[in-house]
A protein has these predicted regions:
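N-terminal secretory signal peptides that target proteins for export/translocation
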Residues: 1-11
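Intrinsically disordered, low-complexity sequence elements enriched in Ser/Thr/Gly/Pro
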Residues: 5-7, 18, 35, 41
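Hydrophobic H-region at the start of alpha-helical membrane spans
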Residues: 15-18, 91
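Bacterial N-terminal signal peptides
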Residues: 17-27
């Protein structure tokens, strides 16, 4: 894992900004655009403000082994942290989607009587500045779902917490058939493990990834992504979900999935989408559990980040 300086830094990179603007490609007059995604950026540090004691308590409760941090050399541009009782996230003010969303799923959240609200209270997030956030109109007629990262189904006991999952800061543009079927079933699997084992820590987010960048013979240093609406909400190429919980042996266990943002057949073998946490970190520039960097956590670090289960866990969770 990697660490980063936690001191407050400026958001603006005078060198990178005009390059990225020059690379922006608008296609026709539709609400969907294409733009060049830089695969590797120059050094940049995100701003981090201090937390109140209440915020620190929420982060400690929801983010296992520390709040995710940026890896050095991976400037994610201007971001805004959002802390709510049910989740903590970091939202990209450039892409208008979260980089990651942390949750803790336990008996206080799951197995309640709440169903999906009707109508669903999708809305822009007042904690983010207008012009640097997704708006409802960006998704309208875009052809993409407003895809939850912290799902509404993870909050079935308290209406206010479920309503909080409907802020657009917790959404990414997601292919509807993917969002409503294959991805939803993955969310249900994770909830099942949390219920079976009593709790689970979950980190979910988008990826901008082109497999050609893994091979020096095909890597170009950039690739095309799509964006929707007047606010240019970035459409991720992939989504990841990480689950960490205690197995039947009492030891911490982890499993992570990466799925392309596309349509899937009716029956999906989720084993095909298992990846290591380290693999995801290397391709997102995010250190998901920074406290594992401490020397006393070296063995656990190795176990959680590098192990790749060969099979999807059974319904009652891992050994």
């Amino acid at each position: 894992m990697t660490t980063k300086n936690n001191q407050r830094r400026t958001h603006f990179s005078a060198t990178l900004f005009p390059i990225c603007i020059a690379l922006l490609l608008l296609v026709g007059c539709s609400t969907t655009t294409e733009q060049v995604r830089i695969a590797y950026f120059t050094r940049f540090q995100k701003a981090e403000a201090g937390h109140t004691p209440q915020e620190e308590a929420i982060i400690k409760r929801l983010c296992l082994f520390g709040e995710p941090k940026h890896a050095p050399g991976w400037p994610h541009g201007p971001t805004e942290e959002i802390i709510r009782d049910g989740y903590v996230l970091e939202n990209s003010l450039a892409d208008k989607i979260p980089l990651w969303v942390c949750e803790h799923l336990g008996n206080e959240d799951l197995g309640g009587p709440l169903k999906r609200p009707d109508p669903e209270p999708f809305r822009s997030d007042p904690k983010l500045p207008a012009g640097s956030r997704a708006e409802l109109k960006d998704y309208k007629h875009s052809g993409y779902d407003r895809g939850h990262q912290a799902p509404s189904g993870d909050e079935t006991k308290k209406q206010s917490l479920q309503n909080d999952t409907y802020f657009l800061s917790n959404m990414v543009p997601q292919i509807g058939q993917f969002n409503q079927h294959a991805w939803e079933r993955l969310e249900e699997m994770v909830r099942g493990w949390a219920i079976a084992r009593g709790e689970a820590y979950v980190i979910t987010g988008p990826m901008f990834y082109d497999p050609r960048e893994d091979d020096p013979h095909t890597a170009a240093g950039h690739f095309i992504i799509k964006a929707i609406g007047k606010d240019h909400v970035a459409v991720p190429t992939h989504l990841y979900k990480i689950a960490v919980l205690r197995g039947k042996s009492g030891q911490w266990r982890s499993i992570a999935f990466v799925m392309k943002n596309q349509k899937y057949p009716k029956h999906v073998d989720y084993k095909d989408f298992i990846q290591s946490i380290r693999w995801i970190e290397d391709r997102t520039g995010i250190n998901f559990m920074p406290e594992l960097d401490q020397p006393e956590n070296a063995a656990l670090h190795q176990q959680l980040e590098r192990d790749v289960p060969t099979q999807v866990w059974p319904e009652d969770g891992p050994e």
